[in-house]
Amino acid sequence: MTHLNFETRMPLGTAVIDQFLGLRPHPTKIQATYVWIDGTGENLRSKTRTFDKLPKRIEDYPIWNYDGSSTGQAKGRDSDRYLRPVAAYPDPFLGGGNKLVMCDTLDHQMQPTATSHRQACAEIMHEIRDTRPWFGMEQEYLIVDRDEHPLGWPKHGFPDPQGKYYCSVGADRAFGREVVETHYRACLHAGLNIFGTNAEVTPGQWEFQIGTCEGIDMGDQLWMSRYILHRVAEQFGVCVSLDPKPKVTMGDWNGAGCHTNFSTAEMRAPGGIAAIEAAMTGLKRTHLEAMKVYDPHGGEDNLRRLTGRHETSSADKFSWGVANRGCSIRIPRQVAAERKGYLEDRRPSSNCDPYQVTAMIAQSILF
C-alpha cells in the first residue's frame, strides 16, 4: 500500500469545523445522514440531506437513491439503487435534532441487493418473536494508522508479547483510548445499547459490546455503532480494521472476533440450562453452513482466525463447553452455576454481518 503523508492536513481544519458545529441548531430544519452497507458487505457509506422538520416515525423518512455503480452494487448502465430507512438515531456528531438513519439497500425492482440481508433477518425474527430472542455482540477491532500499521506498534519489529495489554492501563500498553472513550460517549448519545468496552489481548486492539437487543434491533445497532466508530476514528486521523486476522498479526497474536451472546425467554427462566444445552444439537447440525456466513467472504476470513489457537476453536469442527474459550460455543461458568442464562457463539468474525449471524443462530436453534 502507498505510504501516505500524515502531515498533509487542512490548515486549522479542526478549529474551523468546531466553530460551525458549535452554532445553535436551526429552529426547524434538520440534517439526516443515511447510512448503508456497500457491495463489500462490510464497509459503510453515508450521505446527508435536509428535512424541513424532524420526521416523527421511521416511515416518515423517504426512500432515497444513490449511485450503486460507485459502491459495487450496480453497473453503470443501470446504476440507481434505493435506500430504505429502517432505524433512526440521534446524531452525536451534529447534535440538535439531527439524525443518523440506518438503511436497507434495494435494487431497481425494489428487492434487497446482494449484500443487504436485513429483510431476510427481519422475517426470521418476526417468526420467532414469541420466544423473546435476546442478543449481545462483542465487537473487536484494531486501531491502525493510514498505512494499516497498528497503533502502538514499532514501525520496525514487534511490540512485547501479548499478556500485558488486555484491560490494561498505561501509555506503554493501552493505545488509542481517546478513540475508545469518544466512541463510547457517542454511542450513548445516539441511544445505542452499548454495554461496555475494554482493551483486548493484542496491542492496539479493543472491544465494545452492544446489547442486550431483541430481534432485528441487534443488527441495526451494531451496524450503526460501527459507523460511529469509523467516524470517530476519522476525526482522530486513524482508521479501524475489522479484519479478523490482519497480516501484521499473523504471528503469535490473537485475532478479532464478534462473539455473539444469545438467549430466549426459556433459557433465561429457572432451569433454562436444559434449553441451552438442547440448543447445541441445532448449532452442531448447521456448523458448516454457519461458517459460510460468519464472515463476508464465505468463511475464508475465519480460516485465518479459527485455528484452535489464541482462544479460538477449529473452523471445521463444532465443539461446546463450560467456560472454555477454545470451543465454538461457550456456556459461561456463572450460567452453568445458576442453571439459566445464555450461550456465547465464538465463531463470528469481527467483520461479520450481524443480520446474517443473528438469523443463523435463530434458525439453528429455533427452526
From Swiss-Prot:
Source species, domain of life: Eukaryota
EC class of the enzyme, as a word: ligase
Signal sequence interval, chain numbering: none
InterPro entries linked to this entry: Gln_synt_N (IPR008147), Gln_synt_N_sf (IPR036651), Gln_synth/guanido_kin_cat_dom (IPR014746), Gln_synth_cat_dom (IPR008146), Gln_synth_N_conserv_site (IPR027302), Glutamine_Synthetase (IPR050292)
Keywords attached to this entry: ATP-binding, Cytoplasm, Ligase, Nucleotide-binding
Presence of the UniProt keyword Chaperone in the record: no
GS beta-grasp domain span: 30-110
BP GO annotations: glutamine biosynthetic process
EC number in record: 6.3.1.2
Coiled-coil residues: none
Pfam families recorded: Gln-synt_C, Gln-synt_N
Subcellular location: Cytoplasm
Domain GS catalytic stretches: 117-367
Molecular-function GO terms, alphabetical: ATP binding; glutamine synthetase activity
GO terms for cellular component: cytoplasm
Record bears the keyword Transport: no
Catalytic activity: L-glutamate + NH4(+) + ATP = L-glutamine + ADP + phosphate + H(+)
Family to which the UniProt record says this protein belongs: Belongs to the glutamine synthetase family.
Subunit structure: Homooctamer.
Protein name per Swiss-Prot or TrEMBL: Probable glutamine synthetase
The gene coding this protein: gln-2
